Amino acid sequence: LVGSEMCIRDSPDKNSFCYSGIFKTICTEISAKKEELEIIDLYRDPFTRPREKVIKKYKELVTWCDRIYIVSPVWWFRLTPRMEIFFDEVFEPGFAYKFVNITKTYAYPVPFLKSKKVRTYVTHGAPALPVLTLYVNSVKLRLVMGVYTFVFGWRLSLFTKTKQFWSVPFVSHKKRTEYLTTVKNDIRKDLGLSL
């Protein structure tokens, strides 16, 4: 049984760790298993307005796939502007979720993409300590609670499968290799391969 995998790549720099490290590792592992793989490249796809055609294509890919891999750097304590636009325009109400009223002034989101499996890798230039403590892990918290639970529903795996790699521009080659080993092992688990 062949699975359908989609990877959303969100890095303008082809030499970045997101692009040349994480993204390429994901593609290599999925290709080795002969899974179907579609790629959304937010910095190479035609993204200027009007973008109705590309948004329609993205929605079709989201509908088609079983699993979504998201790879993005963190800029200013959030993902890149293009990823934020992707969330706004693809994961919109009516396609990805709807609000159901409980009272006149309170509603909750009902996700439409609960069947999708999601794994996310984000890279930080910052070290872990200040982000996890002083900033209360706001990047991951906002991403999982403010985006993913709306469209994919609440589940613990959204937290555990959202990985953050720290101080990426400053760490040693050995540390980057450890990060990529984590990615490789995660993908192999996802694909049902032995480690």
Model-found features: residue ranges?
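Short, small-residue-biased leader/transition segments that mark boundaries at the very start
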Residues: 1-7
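Conserved alpha-helical elements of sugar-nucleotide-dependent glycosyltransferases
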Residues: 17-22, 139-143
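A short, Lys/Arg-enriched amphipathic alpha-helix followed by its capping loop at the start of a domain
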Residues: 21, 25-35
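A short beta-strand-loop structural module common to alpha/beta enzyme folds
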Residues: 34-47, 161-166
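N-terminal beta-loop-helix "entrance" segment that forms/cooperates
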Residues: 42-56, 172-176
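Glycine-rich, highly charged phosphate/nucleotide-binding loops
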Residues: 51-63, 179-186
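Helix-loop-strand module that forms the ligand-binding subsite of alpha/beta enzymes
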Residues: 54-144
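Glycine-rich phosphate/pyrophosphate-binding loop and the adjoining helix
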Residues: 130-195
